[in-house]
Amino acid sequence: MSLRFVIGRAGSGKSTLCLREVQEELKQRPRGKTILYLVPEQMTFQTQQALIGSEDVRGSIRAQVFSFSRLAWKVLQEVGGASRLHIDEAGVHMLLRKIVESRKDGLSVFQKAAEQNGFFEHLGSMIAEFKRYNVTPSNVYEMWQQLDAHSSSAEQKLLANKVYDLQLLYDDFERALIGKYLDSEDYLQLLVEKLPQSEYVNGAEIYIDGFHSFSPQELEIVRQLMICGARVTITLTIDEKTLAQPVNELDLFYETTLTYEKIKQVAREEKIEIEKTIPLMEQPRFHSPALAHLEAHYEARPNEKFNGEASVTISTAANLRAEVEGVAREIRKLVADEKYRYRDIAVLLRNGESYYDVMRTLFTDYNIPHFIDEKRPMSHHPLVECIRSALEIISGNWRYDAVFRCVKTELLYPLDVRKEAMREEMDEFENYCLAYGVQGKRWTAEDPWMYRRYRSLDDTNGMITDSEREMEEKINRLRDVVRTPVIRMQKRLKRAGTVMQMCEAVYLFLEELDVPKKLEELRIRAEESGDFLFATDHEQVWEEVMSLLDTFVEMLGEEKMSLSMFTDVMSTGLEALQFANIPPSLDQVLIANIDHSRLSDVRATFIIGVNEGVIPVAPMDEGMLSDEEREVLGAAGIELAPTTRQTLLEEQFVMYQMVTRASEKLYISCPLADEEGKTLLASSFIKKIKRMFPNVKDSFISNDVNDLSRSEQISYVATPEVTLSYVMQHLLTWKRYGFEGNLDFWWDVYNFYVTSDEWKQKSSRVLSSLFYRNRAKKLSTAVSRDLYGDIIKGSVSRMELFNRCAYAHFAQHGLSLRERDIFKLDAPDIGELFHAALKKIADKLLRENRTWADLSIKECEHLSVLVIEEIAPLLQRQILLSSNRHFYLKQKLQQIIFRTSIILREHAKSSGFVPVDLEVPFGMGGTGSLPPMEFSLPNGVKMEVVGRIDRVDKAEDENGTFLRIIDYKSSSKALDLTEVYYGLALQMLTYLDVVTSNAQTWMKKGHAASPAGVLYFHIHNPIVEMKGDATEAEIEKEILKKFKMKGLVLGDADVVRLMDNKLSTGSSDIISAGLKKDGSFSARSSIASEQEFNVLQKYVHHTFENIGKDITEGVIDIAPYKMGNKAACTFCNFKSVCQFDESLEDNQFRSLKDMKDSEAMEKIREEVGGE
């Protein structure tokens, strides 16, 4: 029994010495005593390759490469102890979830924390840490007693409570495992116990290579190996000079020196002979003088400069993607020009979550074979999502999001259907569920679902059309596809008495869906497309899910569990599932995490993402215990994993290891922005390297080829997949701005794509964008006729839409596009309810020969309740009756109608104008409809402007009959003559024109009528602020002012007084007008003379004719208006259709100048020739 150390700095040949010794021994005595070569888990594959890589050793039974965990498995297989079921990480998390749920009421700190994402991962890691550091539940309990007895501050009490919770959960966890199961840490503890019984290990030659430190648990394994083995050789990265000095925590080799001393102490305790240490002083790894200098002087203060030609490259990149592309280009260059193999190259990084997806995509595009040494979660695989969402459907009462997450896995689809067709049908089905607000009991009820297109409150036709019947049948068929398998599982889960039966219900759910066959189809499809990684994913996921169910049954099979707990425990297990890494092929670029990788034999290393806070790592508290809490426990005798402070001290050694991996070339880079454009800073580590290599120039990796010289641009010509984007970028810039210089090779690249048989078709769509102009071509007369017909019948809103943006009009009224109908109460629905409610009250008053002025406050309230109750079942598929939230909203809407009724009552008392009719149709046909506004266009097409007028009021005096228009709005609005001039606000003046033009035939007395004005009435329930103790009358007066109607009224004092008979001088509380003492109007009055009203009406006719002419001539320009802070695109539903983009030359806003009303009126006069 002896112990031997092989020490040396990085690259000194420690592993090489050990491997050569083993190979020589195998060559001399291939059937001798066992040789164990122990390495960290990440090194096993490459060490096995290195061991049998020489010509003399092509294989071996005598020598085996193990990690500690694999050695445990080997020994337990030999001497017994492996009969207990292994519980993996997913099983641990599931068991912990169950323990926490059952202990929840007794927990002090973790009761609420258990609901946070990642809690069970942290809890599992904490328990594993306890085990690695030989801390038992009783140790934790004793620590709690000690802390509880001396807790005085809030921080001390929090730690005591946290330790109490941890010992409860740890103890429960150990009790659940005892005699039945083994987790990964238990294997190592069993290894310690069983090693003395192992004939395989007894007398073995043992090498321990690649470790820098050992946990107490691992140190016990080393102890037993020294006792059992013939000789243990341990390699450590230490400079021999360090051993001759007192240990200092700031030393580069502090951690490995401590490890050296700990192992020696164990050897002394066990009376193990300590052989003479073998120090290695040379640097055989480094073929580059610069890298040899970097290793030899890394820790020197001040930094030792290297003035020769450095094989170190430092780069900053515009962003993360540009950085990865730069790495990919350099790798291709090394392989093509310098005869590197891909396996000679490694990429090291720390923040892999930011890089891995980008690297997978770009390295594939650059045809670079690569292996990412990082396990991927299974949580996004369709099978895992299907199980999780199906259980969520059942436990969460069939919520929409859970249902359609399950649907979109496509595992609910019948096996023999065409996926593309079923996807389209399911999209329609989802639209139906959104429009009808389908969730909860509606899914499980047997009543067939109804389909009716909702049009408006006035649509009371109960007849079903053929298309509606056809859609109804399809919806009910698809409903059964979705719900039938889930309901079957739901019934089984409710009948289940034990966890085993619940797991069986999940298994049968998957079997009845033919999931194995569907996964096999996915695997075959992935292989056919060359995506072998995803092909193996589909194989692994089924095996892992089955293993998870087996583990669940083994652990808790006979226990009873609520459905909600079963769902939570299963979800926790599913979240922990990971895809196993496929061993790399013989020639791939290795992409690895700096902290976990153990590289050897690479010629070039790329260290990427070297940003401040990443390398060196920024201090952060993670896990169950903070640094301060760990230090308290450490002072009390419980040793745990290093604190953040200790980790930061070790960071220098991690970075030293990182830069000394390559033998020939070192590349260091950082992005200046992340994927979202957020600024990133270069690490101070880069400054250190620059100080050591002053001749190294910092290069910049641009994502814009136009910033580069010709020689640099040529390097961007790589694979056809990648180069296509760069040729596009360059030629697009040339097209817009032109360029100088001889860059004809981009045209050569372009010609390759357009002439290549393989790439001509693939690239045509992309390259065609070079000549793309986002311009809507004018429709032909024939197409325009086909779309709009020989008679154009449209509302005023449609005409205004055309003037806002001709393309939006084409999309809505030509192509009949519309947004997806969603079961929610929007502003148009609320507006429709307000109109209907006020009409119903007004109709009731007309039938009873009463006016608004005749109503009492109590009647206003009663009528508002009555009409809302009558309308609610008819509005938007009974949305106001669908939930408590909507019921509350219904009450708020009723209060608004009540308040509005009170104001209309007050207006009626103060006005000589009385309502003639509400919701007055024109051009709609039927009884009571006024004729449309008709136009005969120059090209022979007829146009009819139709609509419905909210309210028409009438007043009479000795000067005749006057009519005014009242339009109910759910938001504040005024009439802007600038908008009238540009054709954006034509509605009110059109309505006034229609009623005054048809007054003689429409009014009962048959008199002509003059325009009195147009006014907007804002329906709302305002809040007013009053100073002091205001009386109720004062408050009501202030509220009345909030309802002042804005618009444009006839500039006739008598007519204005008819609108507000309380007005003598001053401003009206009812309309936006006021009178001075001399009887003239105040400056802020919104008035127009009768002649101006005539000019405005004439201008409206003129505008409609122009609109009609443009529509029929096929004008569909993508030219939205913009005026001040208003723009047509702001609330447009068709932006994704027109793809308006200001950066394109063809896409610019129609800028409209805002004007004063007087200026606008003058321009209107000029247009129509009015005086």
UniProtKB/Swiss-Prot annotation:
Belongs to the helicase family. AddB/RexB type 1 subfamily. [4Fe-4S] cluster binds at residues 805, 1129, 1132, 1138. GO terms for molecular function: 4 iron, 4 sulfur cluster binding; 5'-3' exonuclease activity; ATP binding; double-stranded DNA binding; helicase activity; metal ion binding. Binds 1 [4Fe-4S] cluster. Keywords: 4Fe-4S, ATP-binding, DNA damage, DNA repair, DNA-binding, Exonuclease, Helicase, Hydrolase, Iron, Iron-sulfur, Metal-binding, Nuclease, Nucleotide-binding. Its EC number is 3.1.-.-. PANTHER family: RECBCD ENZYME SUBUNIT RECC (PTHR30591:SF1). GO terms for biological process: DNA recombination; double-strand break repair via homologous recombination. ATP binds at residues 8-15. Residues 1-390 form the UvrD-like helicase ATP-binding domain. InterPro entries: ADDB_N, DNA_helicase_suAddB, DNA_helicase_UvrD-like_C, P-loop_NTPase, PDDEXK-like_dom_sf, PDDEXK_AddAB-type. Residues 281-587 form the UvrD-like helicase C-terminal domain. This is ATP-dependent helicase/deoxyribonuclease subunit B. Its cofactor is Mg(2+); [4Fe-4S] cluster.
